[in-house]
Amino acid sequence: MMLSASIRLSAALFLLPFVASAQQAFQPPPPAFQTPSGNIHCRFGAGTLRCDVAEHSYAVPPRPRDCTQNWGGSITLRAQGEAALLCAGDTVRDDEAFVLGYGADWLGPGINCDSEESGIRCANRAGHGFQVSRTKLELF
């Protein structure tokens, strides 16, 4: 009887780290994240991912006539549809947001983002998305 309890305890202690790892893997992603440089901040809410680039030198398309606020520094992406620039008078910048290290992925509902030293690349399941850095903006 003692041997059986000892085996169960040993098995439980052996499996405990694996269970903890599995639980961590299934936690929802943080709703907000930033690049290690702090130049790009992203937030997911209401089915939309928005990323703001604080400082950029990339070329932006002409400002729409109805846009009277900041243009070219904010990009949005939903699980369906194409990425788009956003005319924004606010920001999603949060200096306390999770830092998505270079080489790490953010796996949100229907959208995946990769953080690299060259910037952030986000895409939805349909293959639409964007790649952005201080010097480059590509919508695809």
Region locations from a protein language model:
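Bacterial N-terminal signal peptides that target proteins for export
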Residues: 1-11
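Extracellular glycan-recognition/adhesion modules and their associated mucin-like linkers
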Residues: 27-43, 102-107, 112
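Residue-level signal for tight coil/turn positions that link beta-strands
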Residues: 37, 46, 79-81, 108-110, ...
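Primarily extracytoplasmic ectodomains and periplasmic/lumenal surface modules that are beta-strand-rich
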Residues: 40, 46-51, 58, 119-120
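A low-complexity, Ser/Thr/Gly/Pro-enriched, surface-exposed linker/loop concept
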Residues: 49-100, 127, 132-140
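Surface-exposed interaction/gating patches
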Residues: 94-96, 104-105, 120
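Short, exposed beta-strand-loop hairpins at the edges of beta-sheets
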Residues: 112-114, 119-131
